């Protein structure tokens, strides 16, 4: 069994961060060592929540504890998502350094969660800058959305060609795989009823489209689900393109179930059989 140390947010109610990623990854046969960066009552897009940011030193202590019982050599990947403070970025890098010492082949997937002007996603000051400065040089995989891609590259991105230039800039900096979630108006198809996503590697760029469900309130945690299931499929031995397609079909099933149930929260439990055996078969097209 493959193991992932997943360092991201936790919500008591609902599905975001580790709550969104853990169960689907475990369904796919990958164990998740969940280490929380924050513990909130619910995700921040409700507009009100309670809870706390986990002190940065706790991350280091827990990683050290795992090393003390000689478990870091069993860690196949590090996954980072929503961070509660800029200082936590340094603790992520400490975790990566320790894991790589014990398992040099371990992967690092950085989901660079950043504030969005059209969403109530609250991110602490300095996190964006710390991710740009410190995470890009060491990440094997990054999974930004379109807005986060703009912030990571500082490129103006309005067209599909702009997206390609931006992802190639990240690849040039050493990131081996870049997934850009929900291209929106910068998509290749640019249809409001179509969800578009790309994967870029040094070998090329692949594009995939599937239906975009028109929720009254867009569920949170979809990016966490995408990052987690993509990583799980890679660890299970699938090729980049196979993992990209499998993830998209698994996530498509979760989104379809969530929409049909009229839920604001992702319905990963109700959609568990869609994760295990997706009913869709969307295929990626190489575009560059």
From Swiss-Prot:
EC number: 2.7.1.35
Superkingdom classification of source: Bacteria
Binding site for ATP: 111, 148, 181
Entry cofactors: Mg(2+)
Gene Ontology molecular function terms on file: ATP binding; magnesium ion binding; pyridoxal kinase activity
Ligand binding (substrate): 9, 44-45, 224
Reactions the enzyme catalyzes: pyridoxal + ATP = pyridoxal 5'-phosphate + ADP + H(+)
Annotated Gene Ontology cellular component terms: cytosol
Enzyme kind, highest EC tier: transferase
GO terms, biological process: pyridoxal 5'-phosphate salvage
Biological role: Pyridoxal kinase involved in the salvage pathway of pyridoxal 5'-phosphate (PLP). Catalyzes the phosphorylation of pyridoxal to PLP.
Family: Belongs to the pyridoxine kinase family. PdxY subfamily.
Self-association and partners: Homodimer.
Protein name: Pyridoxal kinase PdxY
